[in-house]
Each structure stands twice: as C-alpha cells, then as structure tokens.
Amino acid sequence: MTPAHSRPGPEAPRRSDARRNRERLVDAARAVFTESGPEASLNEIAQRAGVGPGTLYRNFPNRQTLLAAVLRDRIDTLCGHAERLLTADSPDRALAEWLRAFLEHARVNQGLGGSLLLDEPETLGLDCHRRIEDAAAALLVRAQRSGTARGDLAPDDLVQLVVGIALATVRVEDAAQPGRLLELALDAVHAAPRPA
C-alpha cells in the first residue's frame, strides 16, 4: 500500500485549474457586471469565462458571493494602486491620483455595492470601507508630512468627499462634472496652492 503523501496523481494540477477557473470567473464577472449591472446573467459570466454553470456554482454558490468576490478584487486593485503611489516623488500628486482612481471606483461600483448591502453580511462592507480608509490614510499622512495637505483633514473626510461626489453625479449628463468637483475638493485639501 502506498502512503497517501507519496501517491502520484493530478491533485496539484486540478487545484491549479480550479484556481484558474475561479480567476477567470471573477475576471468575466467584473466585465459583465460593468456592462450590465449586478443583475447580469450568471450564464453569460460562465460562458465568457469558458466554464460551465456547474463550475460557476461550485466556486460561487449564489450571485452575492460572486458580487462580493468582484468587489474584493476591485478593492484589492484600488488599494494596490495606493501602495504603489506611496513611493511616488510627489505626495501631493500621489494623493490626487489615488483620489481620482477612487472616484472612478466609487462611480463604477455603486450598483455592485448597493446590491451587496441588501444581502451580504455587514462585515464585508465594513472591511471594504476600512481598507479604502487605510489606503487614503497612508497617502494623506504622507502629504500632510510634506506640508501639502491640511493637517486637520481626516482620512474619513476624504473618503466621504469622494463618495459624495460619486453619489451626486450618478446621473449627470456632463461626464466631466465628477472630475471638476474632485478638483474643487482637492483645492480644499491642500495647505498651500498646488503646482499646476
């Protein structure tokens, strides 16, 4: 009898395939949810990922778990961007660039977040908010230490400003308005006039 730990077999490749299938499902879901909203067809997502519906449901038993995975993936991307910006030469420009990315994230993910809030445990929302606030805090503190951001500004102030802009401009016809409003908010963030 061969011990279990030395048995040859395709166990590792299957786990690798399963991981790739999950990644493809999240990638496809991200695209389909962006195009069609959180109520998009799960069959369309499976088809775009190149897997069957059974594979989708083995990985994500319901729509909410798939929505949560997509939201976490998007937040990972947003927070990873903040981490990379921590090494940028200009703390001021790094903060502004990340806030622009956060505004885009908030505008694109409104329906996704709203759908999750209806059915998903509160802990997901709290975790997402904490991660975004931590990313904002790291960039804000760096700008404050360099003297380009107001010292009395809290990370939650920035997060609320950006979310407010995203909510206020959800149905505007002027596509440039969210960016203009963010630039006005950025002017209020700075302790001194920003370089052009």
Where are these regions (language model features)?
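C-terminal peripheral helix-coil segments that are non-catalytic and often amphipathic
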Residues: 1-9, 134-149, 171-196
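Basic, helix-initiating cap at the start of DNA-binding domains
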Residues: 1-48, 65
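Short, hydrophobic secondary-structure boundary micro-motifs
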Residues: 41, 111-117, 148, 152-153, ...
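Short hydrophobic/aromatic patch on the recognition helix
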Residues: 50-60
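Alpha-helical DNA-contacting segments of helix-turn-helix folds
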Residues: 60, 67-74
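Short secondary-structure transition hinges
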Residues: 65, 97, 103-138, 164-171
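Hydrophobic alpha-helical connector segments
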Residues: 69, 76, 80-107, 124
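All-alpha amphipathic helical-bundle segments outside canonical DNA-binding/catalytic cores
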Residues: 124-128, 145-160, 172-177
